[in-house]
């Protein structure tokens, strides 16, 4: 999320998990002709008043390029998975893009959540050349801040983008993001010393945070997120070779493939104890893979802790 003040997607999820336009002019729907009846085509209309930090216009060519750039295997882009199932991304006009999927796709917003980079800056650095792009160390985006200093592993300084496309934003003239160090030092710099205004997603023990709060200048705000920490066990057989591979998806683990075994393991999980003694205030015990926003948190998934139960 560190690039969010500088680079933007077509859409993003708000605090309620609803998709809202950023660089897109509107959310596609059946009513406005943006979604096809067969669930395979999405038409994105783009804002017309958006400029890159270097003054060049943001257009459909950039959106098409971001797809081409990300899915090139030689680039090894971490965003490539968000384009899974996309057959093609086509330019309709200067500010309209058509995305065609190989099959009906309900999560068609995912590829639109990719933070955009400018074609005119990165076109010469496709594939394996992507690592050599000078803009990797001084990114050019459309966001509310533009980078004036970037020291990898240490510091990013951003200044207000006077041409930002959303009115009355941002609210600060200068942004300084400090990297490096460890989580405890970051918490201390904000909560105790007051050297920085904000630290996000602190992986620090709750007791340590409480001590910092008691005599410090800052406070801890706990906001449940949508991510879940869990242990995943492979239900394939590691001792059997299928098509030249062990633990092949077509094989079945002799123990873990038994539903009764998995049910028993669920009953042995003391989620409340893990929440209290490991995560403290910052943890929310849940049997769901998606815990937030609340409307996606299923109440029908069993989470009983009972070592005496029979399955």
Regions found by a protein language model. Give the residues of each.
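A bilobed periplasmic-binding-protein/Venus flytrap-type ligand-binding module shared by bacterial periplasmic
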Residues: 159-163, 181, 228-260, 277
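Gly/Pro-rich hinge or "lid" segments in bacterial periplasmic/extracellular proteins
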Residues: 4, 12-18, 113-176, 309-311
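Aromatic- and charge-enriched surface segment that lines or borders ligand/interaction sites
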Residues: 26-76, 92, 98, 186-192, ...
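Ligand-binding "clamshell"
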Residues: 208-223, 235
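Structural transition elements
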Residues: 145, 284-311
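Ligand-site clamp/hinge motif
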Residues: 43, 133-136, 163-211, 259
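Surface-exposed binding/hinge segments that line
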Residues: 79-127, 149
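N-terminal lobe/hinge region of extracytoplasmic solute-binding protein
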Residues: 1-37, 68, 138-142
């Amino acid at each position: 999320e560190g690039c969010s003040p500088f680079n933007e997607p077509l859409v993003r999820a708000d605090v309620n998990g609803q998709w809202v336009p950023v660089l897109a002019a509107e959310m596609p729907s059946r009513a406005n002709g943006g979604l096809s009846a067969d669930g395979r085509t999405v038409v994105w209309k783009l804002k017309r008043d958006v400029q890159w930090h270097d003054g060049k216009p943001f257009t459909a060519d950039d959106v098409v390029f971001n797809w081409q750039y990300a899915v090139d295997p030689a680039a090894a882009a971490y965003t490539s998975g968000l384009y899974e199932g996309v057959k093609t991304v086509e330019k309709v006009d200067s500010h309209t893009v058509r995305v065609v999927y190989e099959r009906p796709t309900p999560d068609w917003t995912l590829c639109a959540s990719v933070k955009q980079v400018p074609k005119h800056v990165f076109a010469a650095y496709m594939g394996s050349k992507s690592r050599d792009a000078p803009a990797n160390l001084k990114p050019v985006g459309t966001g509310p801040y533009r980078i004036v200093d970037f020291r990898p592993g240490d510091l990013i300084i951003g200044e207000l983008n006077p041409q930002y496309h959303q009115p009355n934003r941002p609210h600060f003239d200068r942004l300084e993001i400090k990297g490096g160090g460890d989580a405890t030092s970051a918490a201390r710099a904000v909560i105790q010393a007051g050297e920085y205004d904000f630290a996000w997603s602190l992986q620090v023990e709750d007791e340590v945070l409480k001590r910092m709060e008691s005599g410090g200048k800052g406070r801890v705000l706990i906001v449940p997120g949508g991510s879940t920490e869990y242990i995943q066990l492979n239900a394939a057989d590691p001792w059997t070779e299928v098509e030249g591979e062990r633990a092949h998806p077509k094989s079945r683990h002799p123990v873990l493939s038994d539903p009764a075994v998995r049910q028993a393991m669920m009953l042995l999980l003391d989620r409340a104890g893990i929440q209290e003694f490991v995560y403290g205030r910052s943890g929310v015990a849940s049997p769901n893979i998606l815990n937030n926003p609340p409307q996606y948190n299923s109440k029908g998934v069993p989470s009983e802790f009972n070592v005496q139960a029979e399955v």
